[in-house]
Regions:
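C-terminal interaction-tip segments
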Residues: 1-32, 90-91, 98-118
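Hydrophobic residues on conserved beta-strands that form the core of alpha/beta folds
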Residues: 34-36, 83
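Short, surface-exposed beta-strand/strand-loop-strand elements in extracellular ectodomains
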Residues: 45-67
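A structural signal for the main folded, soluble domain(s) of proteins
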Residues: 27-29, 45, 71, 82-84
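Beta-sandwich interaction modules
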Residues: 74-91
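Short proline/glycine- and polar residue-rich coil/turn motifs
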Residues: 13-16, 72-78
């Protein structure tokens, strides 16, 4: 029997400083999990945002991002980072982090979402 889940991690930036958030998901031992990963910012184009994506599965992100890491500036709602149908075997881990350098002091929010079926 399959189980659908969604995990959110969100941070709101309210001052002129750097904010950082991360989400780690580990697939249940003995089960494969198919996940979709999304990272986006609101409002768009307010500050530079960097994104990192890592996994303990050797070479598994290479087809999506060579080197298993991605940095994009700026990350906006219209071109949010998306990885679809990423397969994790039981016990595999995916680590997603995002940071915003809120230079203008404008209230902004970054959200990481991992959605999947186990």
């Amino acid at each position: 029997m399959s189980e659908t889940f969604t995990i959110f991690k969100e941070i709101t930036c309210t001052a002129a400083t750097t904010y950082y958030t991360e989400l780690v998901y580990t697939a249940p031992v003995g089960r494969a999990v198919i996940v979709d990963i999304r990272i986006w910012a609101v409002p768009t184009n307010t500050a530079p945002i960097g994104v990192s994506l890592w996994t303990n599965k050797e070479g598994s992100l290479d087809e999506y991002m060579p080197g298993m890491e991605c940095y994009r500036y700026p990350l906006t709602a219209s071109d949010a980072l998306r990885i679809d149908r990423f397969v994790l075997e039981g016990g595999d881990r995916v680590y997603v982090s995002a940071f915003v350098d809120n230079e203008q002091g404008i209230d902004s929010k970054i959200t990481i979402q991992v959605r999947g079926v186990a």
